Amino acid sequence: DKLTESRKQTADKFAADVKKQLEYLDMPKINFVVDFKKGIMSSSGIDKIEFLISANPGEAPKPLAKIASGGELSRIMLGIKSILAYNDTVDTLIFDEIDTGVSGRASQKIGLKLKEVSKNTQVICVTHSAQIASNADCHFLISKDVSGSRTFTSVKQLSRDERRCELARIMGGLEITDAMLNSAEELLQTNFGK
């Protein structure tokens, strides 16, 4: 009972901290709950713990694993990892398309949060967002080519100028214009001052 009570107190603070992180990541209406149920007694106690969320006011929280989209799961994981980053022993975090279904403003916040987490843990992020990619210390371009009946994937580390061109390409359209290149440069200047 003491262990359960201690966990519940910690869980309340943890849930409040996660909610703050998710509000920052443009999920302002989310309700995040740590749910406790009695399980089978083991060496780690009797508690069976599950994360529940409701993305909209008035909805009852439901199991995170069942209702969250891929983009929501990535942002929730990022929020949790940003809280645990200083105590976590994970060497590398991988986020695949964390930008799915989010606005440019949310992408910028996600990029900043990823940069913050990367101070303590290596972060690999696959993204289609210039706002997120512009925060990276190192930028790789992944491309697929079909030759005959085979598909080949290539990975290339981008130079500073190639990076600016790639950010402009991500931002926009069939032709890279001077305005897009200037916007890409501004993102890099804002994030790195160079």
List PLM regions with ranges:
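Charged, surface-exposed helical/loop "interaction arms" that form contiguous linear patches used
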Residues: 1-40
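Flexible glycine-/small-residue-rich
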Residues: 34-38, 53-57, 80-82, 143-144, ...
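C-terminal lobe/lid and adjacent interdomain/linker elements of RecA-like ASCE P-loop ATPase modules
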Residues: 49, 105-194
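GG-anchored amphipathic helix commonly corresponding to the ABC/SMC/Rad50 NBD signature/C-loop
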Residues: 51, 55-58, 73-93
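Conserved D-loop-proximal element of ABC-family nucleotide-binding domains
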Residues: 87-88, 100-108
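Walker B catalytic acidic pair
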Residues: 96-97
